[in-house]
Each structure stands twice: as structure tokens, then as C-alpha cells.
Amino acid sequence: LPALRWAGVRLRFVWAWRHRAVRTMVRLSGWTVGYVIANQVALWVVLILANGRNGGPFVYLSAYAFFQLPHGLLAVSLMTTIAPEMASAAERNDLAGLRERLSFGLRLTTFVIVPCAAAFISLARPIVVALLQRGAFSAADAEVVAQTIAGFSLGLVPFSIYLFSLRAFYSMQDTRTPFMLNCFENALNIALAFPLYFAFGVPGLALAFAGAYAGAAAVTLVVLRRRIGDVDSRRFGDTLARSLVAGAFVAGTTWLIARGIGWSSTWAAVGATALGLVIGFAEYFAVAAALRMREVDDLWSLFAPRVRRGGRGGPAGGPAVAISGPADREGRTV
């Protein structure tokens, strides 16, 4: 609001509840409220299960906070950049343009999230030791949190793919379909949570989360294909396969670094984490370049103009209004 005032925009309240825009917003937001409620129901069930273990809710929520970091920094940045272009294409009824932008976003999201998932799986223990293990937080606690982070990380790629895919529905001003898909995801999460919790404890709840989003991502892509046509699935599959190959190198290298340096002290854990991330991501881009992945150039072409402008302005596709997504399990917009 201050920025708008500085730009000379004059704002005033208008009580026009029958305005078409207001009615549209109410209609769309109703399903979004249902989306959030479904998330909270699943979270409530999961936390009740986690409460059966000492410190279980803390372990689950702490691991979830770590898990959200790469998604929030990278995947959400891509969504913010590409979603307006998807909305613009949908507004023009340009399904080919919508499919192209969706495919582009899915491929870039996969490309940037795979190495994060690989690094989190291998570096979970030194990360937790570096940031959490002190005072009453013991080495045993660190081990459980690290295992839970690793479980969540197995679902990091499908989680980001699922949330990005929902942007296609929001671009078409459809919030009902995301609500239905989210009900499926939460039902699957609850169904998986019980057996996996009793088998593996709190880390099993993270595995249930990962499995639920893997299933939801697959179903969402099928629904999208029926709705708008094929989103260049062959090319997306090729990107996923090559990213997983490069990610395997990251996982192996970061695991060797973590084992070599160890995490017997806070500073050792910091060193293992920092060195692992630097070398791991450098290796990922080197392998991706060797595999001739076009996403390396695509990523640079997407963000380089924005960096040169100092982050000012919107994407190259021009201004457009995109409907924001619903909130995640902790109430943040995703």
C-alpha cells in the first residue's frame, strides 16, 4: 500500500458487494477455504499420531520447516514468474500457450528441486547437528529429525510439481478441481500415515506425506492432460530422468563429504554442510551440462533479464493477474 501511494495511486473503499468481481472472488475463495480446511484436518490427524512419540510433533514440524525451504526459495520463485504468463494465456483462451508455459514451468521446477532433494537426503544429519543440536536437543533427537527430513525430501519433487500444476487450474479460474485433488491427497496421506507411523515412527509420517504428494502429482497431471491436452509429457519425462541422474551424483558426493568430515561437533557439521552444498550443486550443473539439458540455458534466460533490471518488472510475457493459490498446512500461501 505505501508503494502504491508513492506511485500516486489514490485508493478508497467502495462497498459494492454485488459487483461482478466481488461475486467471482467469493465463488472462487469458497473452494480455497475448503482446500485449507482439508489440509488442517490431515495435519491434525498426523500430529495426533506424532504425539504418541516423545517430542513427535516438534520433530515433524521442525523437519517440515527444513523441507519447505528449497520449495519456498526456488519453486515458489518460478511459480511467481511463470504463473502470470499462464493466466494471460488462459485469459486469451490460448490453450497451446498455457500448455507451453505449464510444461516449461514443470521442467524448470523439476530441474532446480531434484538437487535440493538429493542434498537434503544426504546432508540431513549434519544440517540438523549444525542448526539444532545443542542444550537438551540430543544426538538421538538429531537422528530422528534427520530421518524425518530425509523422508520429506523423497517427496520434495512431487510436492513442487503438484503445487505448480495447480497453477494451471487457478489460471483458468478453477478452484474447485484443486479442492477435489487436495481432498484426494489428504485422504491418501491419512491412509498411509497409520501403517507407516506404526512401522517407522515419526519418519514414517514424512514418508506418508511424500507418498501422498507423489500420488497427487500423478493424478493431477492426468487430470490436466484431459482438461487442456498433453503438456509435452515426453520432454518432461526426459527432463525428470536426466535430473535424477545428475541428482544421483549429488547424493553420492554429498554423502561422501558428510561421512568424510563427520558431524561430531557443530563446526564439523557446518563444514560438511557448506562444502557438500557447494560441491554438490556445482557437480549437478556440470553433469546437467554434460547431459545437454536445455534447462540450464532456460533457467538463465528466465532470470538473467530480471537480475540485470535489479529484480524490477514482471516477466517477459507482460502484466497479468494470476489467482494466488491456497495456503499450505501451516497457513502460508503456496
Per-region residue spans from a language model:
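Membrane-interface helix-loop junctions in multi-pass transport and translocation proteins
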Residues: 1-2, 176, 186-218, 222, ...
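Interhelical loop/hinge segments that connect adjacent transmembrane helices in multipass membrane
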Residues: 2-39, 96, 226-241, 301
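Transmembrane helical elements of multi-pass membrane transporters/channels
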Residues: 19-88, 121, 159, 250, ...
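Interfacial transmembrane-helix starts/ends
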Residues: 26, 61, 82, 94-123, ...
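Small-residue-rich hydrophobic transmembrane alpha-helices
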Residues: 76-97, 163-170
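Interfacial segments at transmembrane-helix termini and the short loops linking adjacent helices
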Residues: 121-155
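Alpha-helical transmembrane segments of multi-pass membrane transporters/permeases
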Residues: 154, 161-195
